UniProtKB/Swiss-Prot annotation:
Protein name: UDP-N-acetylenolpyruvoylglucosamine reductase
Position of the signal peptide: none
Source species taxonomy: Bacteria, Pseudomonadati, Pseudomonadota, Alphaproteobacteria, Magnetococcales
Enzymatic reactions: UDP-N-acetyl-alpha-D-muramate + NADP(+) = UDP-N-acetyl-3-O-(1-carboxyvinyl)-alpha-D-glucosamine + NADPH + H(+)
Species for this entry: Magnetococcus marinus (strain ATCC BAA-1437 / JCM 17883 / MC-1)
Cofactor(s) the protein needs: FAD
Record's subcellular location: Cytoplasm
GO CC annotations, alphabetized: cytosol
Length: 311
C-alpha cells in the first residue's frame, strides 16, 4: 500500500494503491482494493467525480459494516470519506430542539453522542449502530422502532459529475432498509431535526439500547450485522432458527449461536464460505417456510456491489 499518482490523482485527493479491505470492514474478510481515494473535502470529492475515469467501478466505503468483500478484492476505486468528511455541527438550537448537520463520513455512534451532549433527542437509536451517516442514509438505518427517516430534515448529495443536490426524506424514498439513491450519486451530509431532550435521560436510553444489543448480538466475533432483511410479518432470525441452522458452520464462517441473523467470522473465514452459508440459509428457509429472504448486507465483488448471493 502506498501513495500513488493513480488514474484520478490530484492535490485535493489522497490515492493509495492495492489497499487491504478486510481491516476496513466489521466482518474482517476480503482482498485488496485496486485504488483507495480519500478526498480532502467536498471540493476534493467534486474534483474526483469530475476527473476520475468513468470506466473504473467505484464503491463508497463508510464504516465497513453491512458488507462482505470478496477474497479477490475490488478492481476499482474505493472512496473513503471517513477521514475528512466527518464534521458534526449544531446548526440551530432553541427551547424546542435543534438542527444537527452531519457529514457523510461521520460515525453514527459519535453522532448520537454529540446530539446527546447538546441536549438533542432522536438519535439515541444510532448509539449501537456501527458505520457512518452516509451508510445510515443509504439503507435508512434503524433500531428499536426508530429510523433515519423519522428525524431527517434533508440530505446533500453529489451526482456523478460533481454537482451538489438537496433532497428531503420523501424525495429520497426512504422506507424499511431502502433509499432511492440515484446511480452514481454520493451522500455528502445530512441535517437532522431533533427535539429538545435532557442529556442524562438520553444517556440512560442509550445505555439501555446498548445493554439490549450486548444481550442479543454476538459481539465477540466479527460480523457484518444483520445478514437478511426481516420479511413482512416475520423475523429473519426466527425463520433461520426454524430451518435448524443456528450455529451451522462452513469453515470459519458460522451462523451465530447467539443470533441467527448474524453470520460471524470465527477467525479465518473466506468470502466463499460466507457466501455458501448465506445461500444455504436462503435455500433452507425457502424450503421450510416458503419465504425468500432478501439480503440486507451488500457483497463487494471485483466488478462491483451485488445485493444477492451467487458467484
Amino acid at each position: 500500500m502506498k501513495g500513488s499518482h493513480g488514474p484520478c490523482s490530484d492535490l485535493t485527493v489522497t490515492m493509495l494503491e492495492n489497499v487491504p479491505l478486510a481491516p476496513l470492514t466489521t466482518l474482517k474478510i476480503g482482498g485488496n482494493a485496486r485504488w483507495l481515494v480519500r478526498p480532502s473535502g467536498v471540493k476534493g470529492l467534486s474534483r474526483y467525480c469530475r476527473t476520475c475515469p468513468g470506466d473504473l467501478p467505484r464503491f463508497i466505503l463508510g464504516g465497513g459494516s453491512n458488507l462482505l468483500v470478496d477474497d479477490n478484492g475490488f478492481h476499482g476505486v474505493v472512496v473513503d470519506l471517513t477521514h475528512t468528511l466527518n464534521a458534526i455541527v449544531v446548526e440551530h438550537q432553541d427551547a424546542h430542539g435543534g438542527i444537527l448537520r452531519v457529514e457523510a463520513g461521520a460515525a453514527t455512534r459519535k453522532t448520537a453522542h454529540v446530539a446527546r451532549q447538546n441536549g438533542l433527542a432522536g438519535l439515541a437509536f444510532m448509539a449501537g449502530i456501527p458505520g457512518t451517516i452516509g451508510g445510515a442514509l443509504r439503507m435508512n438505518a434503524g433500531a428499536y422502532g426508530c429510523d433515519v427517516k423519522g428525524v431527517l430534515l434533508d440530505a446533500q448529495l453529489m451526482d456523478a459529475t460533481g454537482n451538489l443536490h438537496t433532497r428531503n426524506a420523501q424525495e429520497l424514498g426512504l422506507a424499511y432498509r431502502h433509499c432511492d439513491l440515484p446511480k452514481g450519486w454520493i451522500f455528502v451530509s445530512a441535517r437532522f431535526h431533533l427535539a429538545r431532550g435532557e442529556s442524562e435521560a438520553i444517556k440512560s436510553q442509550m445505555r439501555d439500547y446498548n445493554h439490549k444489543r450486548t444481550q442479543a448480538q454476538p459481539l465477540r466475533y466479527p460480523s457484518a450485522g444483520s445478514v437478511f432483511r426481516n420479511p413482512a410479518g416475520a423475523a429473519a432470525w426466527q425463520l433461520i432458527d426454524a430451518a435448524g441452522l443456528r450455529g451451522h458452520r462452513i469453515g470459519d464462517a458460522q451462523i451465530s449461536e447467539k443470533h441467527s441473523n448474524f453470520f460471524v467470522n470465527l477467525g479465518a473465514a473466506s468470502s466463499l464460505h460466507m457466501e455458501e452459508l448465506i445461500e444455504l440459509a436462503r435455500n433452507r428457509v425457502a424450503q421450510h417456510s416458503g419465504v425468500q429472504l432478501t439480503l440486507e448486507i451488500g457483497i463487494l465483488t471485483p466488478q462491483g456491489l451485488r445485493t444477492e448471493p451467487g458467484r
